[in-house]
Swiss-Prot record:
Belongs to the HpcH/HpaI aldolase family. KDR aldolase subfamily. GO terms for cellular component: cytoplasm. It is an enzyme of class 4 (lyase). This is 2-keto-3-deoxy-L-rhamnonate aldolase. SUPFAM superfamilies: Phosphoenolpyruvate/pyruvate domain.
Length: 267
């Protein structure tokens, strides 16, 4: 199979294009495929807070593969062994949570790349990523098609942001609003003026360094604000929250005293 590996999500980030995404926390390929038919530019398949196994992630990658929406996998953490598994099942774009230092960023970057550029384990002949050995020259071309995003979501990470941005192999930095606001002393309050100020300056610093800047904002006005600050990959909802809100709104039409939607600034 003489196939050229491409990553449309990464290519659009390189061009500075804005990409609108959706968070998938439902853990099912059925819901993932429904989301893929909606036309979002990218879909974050969450393995950090949603109870996704490697097989769950694999099945969701299969479900969205026929569609234009680009999958982004967030594993529960950035260990070398877990990154190897996620890449082998076919993920091309990773979002690694809780990256606090440049050393962590370098370790993550190394784990995504084959030698001599990194230390990813070699197993293309048994991996979906290489179509079980049928993609010719897979190891020679895969590094260029991988997109590595890291999450900055603590005060420590903010203090080290410039050093993280300098790490080779990091394509973008995602600001995690929920954990960041808690780390700054404002738990469950990403809308606090001080948190908002830090989010704005961080997004601008990321873009000034030539990297992509990402954010999750379930409130439309917050999403628009982040786009105005320069964020260029923004998730504007979470599937489980949208589903529960839709259920609540429908029930409220027929039963008095029921609550309406609960959309907030963070999840």
């Amino acid at each position: 199979m003489n196939a050229l590996l491409t990553n449309p999500f990464k290519e659009r980030l390189r061009k500075g294009e804005v990409q609108i995404g959706l968070w998938l926390s439902s853990t099912t390929s059925y819901m993932a495929e429904i989301a893929a038919t909606s036309g979002y530019d990218w879909l974050l398949i969450d393995g950090e807070h949603a109870p996704n196994t490697i097989q769950d992630l694999y099945h969701q990658l299969q479900a969205v593969a026929p569609y234009a929406s680009q999958p982004v996998i967030r594993p529960v953490e950035g260990s070398k062994s877990l990154i190897k598994q996620v890449l082998d099942i076919g993920a091309q774009t990773l979002l690694i949570p809780m990256v606090d230092t440049a050393d962590q960023a370098r370790q993550v970057s190394s784990a995504t790349r084959y030698p001599p550029y990194g230390e990813r384990g070699v197993g293309a002949s048994v991996a979906r990523a290489a179509r079980w050995g049928r993609i010719e020259n897979y190891m020679a071309q895969v590094n260029d098609s991988l997109c590595l995003l890291v999450q900055v979501e603590s005060k420590t990470a903010l203090d080290n942001l410039d050093e993280i941005l300098d790490v080779e192999g990091i394509d973008g930095v995602f600001i995690g609003p929920a954990d960041l606001s808690a780390s700054l002393g404002y738990p469950d309050n990403a809308g606090h003026p001080e948190v908002q100020r830090i989010i704005e300056t961080s997004i601008r610093r990321i873009r000034a360094a030539g990297k992509a800047a990402g954010f999750l904002a379930v409130a439309p006005d917050m999403a628009q604000q982040c786009l105005a600050w320069g964020a260029n990959f923004v998730a504007v909802g979470v599937d489980t929250m949208l589903y529960s809100d839709a259920l609540d709104q429908r029930l409220a039409m027929f039963k008095s005293g029921k609550n309406g939607p609960r959309i907030k600034g963070s999840y």
